[in-house]
A protein has these predicted regions:
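Polytopic transmembrane helical bundles with strong interfacial aromatic enrichment
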Residues: 1-155
Length: 155
């Protein structure tokens, strides 16, 4: 499953972009009361949830494949994993709830504003997941193939 581990750095940016785009479209659609934006937001949310599932699956494989964990990097990974799992479940729940409300024709103005607040909190989860993931790369080089030899140091 090392193949999946190698995909994580390539896959992970799609759900980040999709979920942040969803939040933006949800904000615009709710504030301007434009159905085009809210319908587009629903589609982007669906794609974002699929992306987060793929990111978590590949991230779990990347954790297994990496051999050089120390207590500090593993603690940072645990925070990253916790927020990643929260993000997947949170946005999947929003997708199910939103779909239900739309099907039952209950996705009305007051509900849209409540849903917008829930959506903005989801943005916080995306941010925290990204922050911890970025720290894993920046501090520990996890997910990179950085190789430094003596000739590079002396240049």
């Amino acid at each position: 499953m090392e193949f999946l581990a190698e995909l994580h750095p390539k896959v992970v940016h799609f759900p980040i972009a999709l979920l942040l785009t969803f939040i933006f479209l949800e904000l615009i659609g709710t504030l301007l009361n434009k159905e085009f934006y809210t319908k587009t937001a629903h589609l982007i949310l669906f794609l974002g949830v699929i992306g987060t599932i793929l990111a978590v699956l590949t991230g779990n494989q990347a954790f297994i494949a990496y051999e050089y964990w120390n207590p500090a990097s593993e603690a940072l990974f645990n925070n990253h994993q916790t927020f990643a799992n929260l993000t997947v479940w949170y946005f999947a729940g929003l997708l199910v709830l939103r779909t239900y409300l739309i099907v039952k024709k209950k996705y009305l103005k007051t509900i849209k504003y409540i849903f917008l607040a829930l959506t903005l909190f989801g943005g916080y989860l995306v941010y925290q997941t990204s922050e911890y993931g970025g720290e894993l790369v920046k501090k520990y080089g996890i997910g990179t193939e950085l190789k430094i030899n003596d000739t590079e140091i002396n240049d």
